[in-house]
């Protein structure tokens, strides 16, 4: 007996949607890494290991429970800071736009 073939496009569409979202997230993350390179963040920081400054994953862990973490990081990025991770100061980056500083802060907080 011949069974009618039921064609469904939902799994294919769902698969494409998931791939598209993953690609968008990866591109956004890559763009923020480029932004970090362009602004010399990676001269003192790395994602997973401590260099001169703390690893971004350690920053993300430290601020994970804080509701104002993004704003606090933006302030440190733009105005500099000292004493949060030892005695070595983090230089200010006042020429970095608030928007770009926020992108960097959000990217850093996802590093855990």
Model-inferred region functions:
Residues 61-67:
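Conserved helix-turn-beta segment immediately C-terminal to the redox Cys motif
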Residues 69, 73, 100-101:
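Stable alpha-helical elements in mature extracytoplasmic
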Residues 30-47:
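Sequence/structural segment immediately N-terminal to covalent heme-attachment motifs in c-type
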Residues 48, 67, 80-84, 111-112:
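A general structural signal marking secondary-structure boundaries and capping sites
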Residues 1-32, 112:
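N-terminal export/targeting leaders of redox proteins
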Residues 43, 52-61, 78-105:
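Axial heme c-ligation environment in periplasmic c-type cytochrome domains
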